[in-house]
Amino acid sequence: MRTPLCDDLGIEFPIFAFTHCRDVVVAVSKAGGFGVLGAVGFSPEQLEIELNWIDEHIGDHRYGVDIVIPNKYEGMDADMSTEDLTKMLQDMVPQQHLAFARKLLNDHGVPTPEGEDNSLKLLGWTEATATPQVEIALRHPKMTLIANALGTPPPDMIEHIHAEGRKVAALCGSPYQARKHADAGVDIVIAQGGEGGGHCGEVGSVVLWPQVVKEIAPVPVLAAGGIGSGAQIAAALALGCQGAWSGSQWLMVEESENTPVQQDTYIKAGSRDTVRSRSFTGKPCRMLRNDWTEAWESPDTPDPLGMPLQYMVSGMAVAATHRYPDQSVDVAFNPVGQVVGQFEKVEKTAAVIERWVNEYLEATEHLDALNAAAGV
């Protein structure tokens, strides 16, 4: 399973794990992969605490940080401080959206304590809020990769990260976006197929991956969207990718912050139980279909706002997901890909890595046997 990217980053397997849980970051990197901590939702102070903890527990291994700077969002042209931008965006959020969201949660028995529900907070989603996160991440020597989940990072940010001796990655959903990343100097492009969890495009992985590989060669490409087994990693590498970027699987490990009730929801779900919805972030995001996503699709309810305004509304549901995980299942923010249909049990992180490696070997041995039988 070793690719040139493994030597580049000093890892054993080209398995990249996106997660918001620091324990999973550490467990993946210690098992030979590369853990990546999602920074959205963390204040600068909270992010510093998380990264310090990772540094203390990860040993000599390396990890990355994922930020979100969309190429289009409300207020992106405003030249102002983070505080002023937050105030401007808060004033743009209609009260009817906040009232609707709060009622939806309350109707499902989920408390929304005044001042503690995370509404109207701007915890990421803009260059102004992501820049401090990058600066904090760069203060940690074991942090060797910054990934942008939406769009091409600003040129000065790419230059700054490179000057600090770190690499830059960015997700894409089309060859056009991949070309923009490569031309800007991004080191690694992550091709996210439409079946992936979280923000994704409409093109399926098996179609997208080779298109992106061809478009930006020799820039290394990571395959994302539909990665839940070693056989799927084998398919990605066969299509020219140098590794796999995964997210959904790490919701189903023992080190995850998810409760058994939340994980049971994933086990019971099928691949057709996910939906691309704008109801949480303002951009199409694949997640489990539930009462929250259904409510925002109704013709007699408010339309989702653009990014980051919608998240300033849905933040109360995200906060409830963490504070009252078992009570909020029907209205929770559950970004997950169609690969959810493969989940059967909760495993240790190291066991997942080991299983994927063995499944990869089985898949490649199967192809070798076919070739041998054909006299190739």
Predicted regions, residues:
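Active-site entrance/lid segments in N-terminal catalytic domains of soluble metabolic enzymes
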Residues: 1-216
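Glycine-rich Rossmann-fold phosphate-binding loop(s) that bind the pyrophosphate
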Residues: 17, 224-225
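Conserved active-site-proximal phosphate/metal-binding subdomains
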Residues: 81-98, 202-222, 228-376
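Residue-level detector of alpha-helix initiation sites
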Residues: 152, 227-228
